[in-house]
Amino acid sequence: MLVYWLDIVGTAVFAISGVLLAGKLRMDPFGVLVLGVVTAVGGGTIRDMALDHGPVFWVKDPTDLVVAMVTSMLTIVLVRQPRRLPKWMLPVLDAVGLAVFVGIGVNKAFNAEAGPLIAVCMGVITGVGGGIIRDVLAREIPMILRTEIYATACIIGGIVHATAYYTFSVPLETASMMGMVVTLLIRLAAIRWHLKLPTFALDENGR
């Protein structure tokens, strides 16, 4: 039940992040709605299509789709000045949503009888897929291709989750919580101390 409600929170926060980016780009209401929804459900959609294990999650149960749409519309109406929001709020809630989405992705892969490598990949895709679609539609460099410790947190958390379950036979729910906590802590540490990955850069001479 806790994971269910955290999933709802994550869906809402991801939708808000899409709407805020659309607002900065001065999109019309339809564009705002599209960016909010694809950010919230895009990763899970890619995952379910890749696993080909039953219908896409929001087709089977439209709760997440409804949450994404309602959150997007409410954000359009209520958040006219994003600067009034505490700076820590969205990044922290985004970190919670990211951790939950990674855990859900790994679980779904294992339930589809996938191996640990694919499970970790599906967890990462669930966590970052929507953001990639959002940034591509907005013609921005996706966050995971920048120096932010974002996908890295997903990968490490997913590995902990998959290893605990597949190698050490930890119950799936317990392994899921372990992976979520690791993902969350890494992401929060990156936010708190502005941790970034080193960059790969070449000058004009290729040096």
Swiss-Prot record:
Parts of the chain that traverse the membrane: 1-21, 30-50, 59-79, 86-106, 113-133, 149-169, 171-191
InterPro entries linked: Gly_transporter
Subcellular location: Cell inner membrane
Pfam families: Gly_transporter
The keyword Cell membrane is annotated on this UniProt entry: yes
Protein keywords: Cell inner membrane, Cell membrane, Membrane, Transmembrane, Transmembrane helix
GO (cellular component) term, any one: plasma membrane
Disulfide bonds: none
Positions in the Periplasmic compartment: 51-58, 107-112, 170
Positions in the Cytoplasmic compartment: 22-29, 80-85, 134-148, 192-207
Coiled coil: none
Membrane topology, from the record: Multi-pass membrane protein
Keyword Lipoprotein: no
Family: Belongs to the UPF0126 family.
Protein name: UPF0126 inner membrane protein YadS
Originating organism: Escherichia coli (strain K12)
